[in-house]
Amino acid sequence: MIREHFEFRQTITTILADDRGHIEAAKSGMLAARREVERQIAGDPYFSATLEPYTPNNPANVPASMARAAAEAGVGPMAAVAGAIARAGVEAMAGAGAAFGLVDNGGDIALVSNREVKIGIYAGASPLSGRFAFLIPPGEEILGICTSSATVGPSISFGTADAVTVFSPDVAAADAWATAICNRITADDTSVLDDLPKTGVLGVLAVIGDAVVRWGDLPPIVRARVDERLITAGSDWQYYGRS
């Protein structure tokens, strides 16, 4: 298996593939998706500024998918950008003939796989962090596995959860819902899960300190040791410890 770190401006990714050509396909797919998003922002700056649902006029495919997913989750379109770009990368890999391909865009993962894959659960200072992993079964369709955190990384969050991971066949939706849930969920208040759509979101795992909240259908969770060196991050990665 080939593992490659790929960065372009704000897009910071890890790509996994069996073939060098599939790595290059992923890069091309992500860059094409970025161009669509950049054109949208250039002509409509509000698209990138708002933290609320927003429907742009005549968007291209990628911005449109972001806006739809974000509107359903009640967040701004940019909450879905990492997932949308990751999906574009894996779609390009599959189009190039890949039976296995993974793009991790800063914790927002798109995956197509002909084998079992372990995805580690990293949750900052939680005592559960780095000790478990999801065991993802093989699947011919693209799967989104997106994680949001209020305590790890530079992304905007209004919550307290150490990690919220959402599974969905729509990677942009997984990304948007991870953000929305992370903004609101606490160990004592899980009412945000009542807002999840009846279809589209497969399962949710939230880690808040030493508390765990599960919703829907999740893949098996197994004991594992997460190697933090494999976490996809740029030079500005950081852990925000609680005071």
UniProtKB/Swiss-Prot annotation:
Gene3D superfamilies per the UniProt record, alphabetical: ApbE-like domains (3.10.520.10)
Q: InterPro entries this protein is in? A: ApbE-like_sf (IPR003374), MA1715-like (IPR037456), UPF0280 (IPR007183)
Name the source's superkingdom. Archaea
Protein family membership: Belongs to the UPF0280 family.
What is the name listed in the Swiss-Prot or TrEMBL entry for this protein? UPF0280 protein Memar_1519
Q: State the organism named in the record.
A: Methanoculleus marisnigri (strain ATCC 35101 / DSM 1498 / JR1)
Q: What is the lineage of its organism?
A: Archaea, Methanobacteriati, Methanobacteriota, Stenosarchaea group, Methanomicrobia
